[in-house]
Amino acid sequence: MLEQTRALESSATIKLVTSGRKSRLPHLVEVRFVASHGGIYVIGAGPRSDWVLNALATDRVKVRVGELAIPCRAQRATLQEVESTYGLFKKKYGNGIVSRWYGGSTLCLYLEFAGRAERRGAVVGESETKSDFDAWKASGRGYYDDVAAAFDSASEEYDFTISRNFVNTWIRRRSLEILARYMKKDDVALEIGCGTGAETLQIAKSVRRVVATDISDRMVSLLTAKLRARRTANVMPLKLGAAAIAQAAPYLYGGRASLVYSLNGALNCEPELDAFASGLERILSPGGYFVCSVRNTICLSEAVLHALLLQFGKSLPRLKQPTMVSVGGMDIPSTYYRPSDFASHFKRSFELKKIIALPAILPPAYLSGHYVRLTAVHKPLEVLERAVAGLPPFNRLGDQTLFVFRRFG
């Protein structure tokens, strides 16, 4: 309880996790709060806010703060509690913020602690790790077990985290735009590392069928729930690691895919890349496209930004591979690739058609906070990004590298 109190005292906001009233999917918002009377008080911006309605409908909610997840019961605060909460909010955040964001709102929720807080790693930026690969390797931990556990842990906050990051959303949009050039309406597509299915649901609108695979049980479960809520019938979620991808054959029409894709670095977490390439050879039809993006060992915009900030050592972790990355509050191993090294794993059966940086000029996602403050340069930089991302040498100097391969035959 002492740790819980300290975590709340040191935090300006909490993440409140509710369940959708119809979909039952996790719904996460970041809100201001005050801790008082053995619980937490939050003020709603309006009575029709989804998170407010969710909390009142389902009663049970979860509060994430620091490394803790705290189960709570939600109920409307009394008028007397509302008045008291406004006073505490003004003391904590100032009259200006309270007036601007909550002026006139009488909706206040009391979140009563309803069980023991669960400890989990704090969700931080991908590069904010506390361990190194040599120490992880010496621990004897199972590679796939750790990767699956990390993405299980990240699943509930995954969509929220991506949507709050400008560069991440730009990369997702750009990746789908490029992938669309290689899709046909009658394609049977196979996805490696589907996550919660944000890309899956978009792609399913444009192809005959998608078999969406991921190593994480919870990621697959979330996608399954989304499909049910949206009544999407042409997607098959499947728990499967990349190296075992040939096992997806029974779920594909004729045992083959005409398009395979893997976005946002899922293959950086697959240590058996040659085994994956062999499985891909068996499952992708001759003439079919394989489109993927992986983290790069050299990132031009990262190096420039760190140099401007006099942080000359911050780019070094990319140079030593494998490395550790933070996912869902856990450190897991990952391997970044020089574009030529990654492409060499597929040269036996695939023609390399394109290499595109994602992004070349914009910063990597974990430095998005610096970029969003420079609103005056957004448009010209994004125009420049599109102009140079596919041209040498810039196409090999991005945070991620997007590859387009075509199966021989």
Where are each of the predicted segments found?
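Conserved class I S-adenosyl-L-methionine
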Residues: 121-184, 198, 202, 290-319
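Class I SAM-dependent methyltransferase SAM/SAH-binding core
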Residues: 196-245
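A short glycine-rich, Lys/Arg-flanked "PGG" loop and its adjoining helix->strand segment in the class I
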Residues: 274-286
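Acceptor-substrate binding/catalytic loop of class I
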Residues: 325-341
